[in-house]
Amino acid sequence: MHLLILLVVLLLERGQTSPLNLNTTHLEGRDQRQLSLFAVVNFPNLKCTTKTGSTTYGTCISTSECTSRSGSASGTCAAGFGVCCYMAVSTCGSSLSYNNTYIQNPGYPSTYTPTTTGTCVYTVNKASSDVCQLRLDFQTFSGFAVTSVGAKTDSMAAAGQTGKNPPTISGTNTGYHMYVNVGADSTDTATLTMTWGDIATAKQYNIFVQQIECSSAYKAPQDCVQYFTGTTGTIQSYGWAGSQLLAGMDYNNCVRTELGYCGIQYKETSGTSIDAFAIFATITNTQIALAALAESTDGVCSAQGTMVTIPMTSLDGVSPLPIATNVPPFPTEFCGGLFGISTGSVATPVQSNQRPFNVHLFTSATPTLDSASTATTGFSLDYTQIPCGI
């Protein structure tokens, strides 16, 4: 949708010109001496950065439209012809119908402690019929209680009306994002449901909701819950920031193949205070110990039902591994206390040339423990795309 601003300029002398440098259409009257010049200024309603900070966003629209949307003007845009309109909802049961809107806890920016157990539901209506997905950016997501074995006491569930819904998450997820597929009909909606089981812990959430059109270059492939772009980046499992792998996870983390790149390398994130790879479940974890273990012929990772899956990996992405006990030539499943394709005590990078690039996490519905009966953290993996021909 484009905003039309009608400026009326009274010209008293022939030859006077409009000072506008935006896209304009001029309409001249018949009177050459007293001439009304109408300039219709068009600018798209794009995401803008508010004056409150570089990570707070709004939509560039007119002042009057911002007021009609119950937003607040925070800085100007479109060469001063528009305002950056900040929009947010925080009351349980609220609905939103505009792009670039925040969903926040009641009383935000203060924390929120519910007085009773129950749910808090927000509804997202499509801003246009061309919208296929929502992208949720968790600028703040903390205080959602989760037990030391991964069971979700508090949770957030996002649901659309088509495709597979994202997993229900809990714990600390500040800085993460999530894609939600919505239906094809213009009246289709999506919901975010907060469920409170712990009424003693203060919670805080500030979720930026972007509506992604079907033709957008940033539309995620089907069933990609996290979608990363760029030749380098870091993929983290939900809850890792709070040192907790969540039970009942089943979702894809996808990386867009950039132009001129044919392979990808993954390795543990270094220098973190949180264990970068700890994927265990409540089976006989003594057989896994604290070493990395790829999918074995006796199916240890599959048997425990908690694992990271990466298609067709090897040390160089091309050559199969030497025949070894319990390690297939192109491992696909990873679990244990170190990431890699070695059963030693050192994590190893792995490569894959199979596209699309995809890291899948599956965790058992049974709460997860490591071999020392303490919480297992999940994973944080750095990726680097590899140019074709290398």
Positions of predicted regions on the chain:
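Domain-level representation of secreted and single-pass membrane ectodomains enriched
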Residues: 2-390
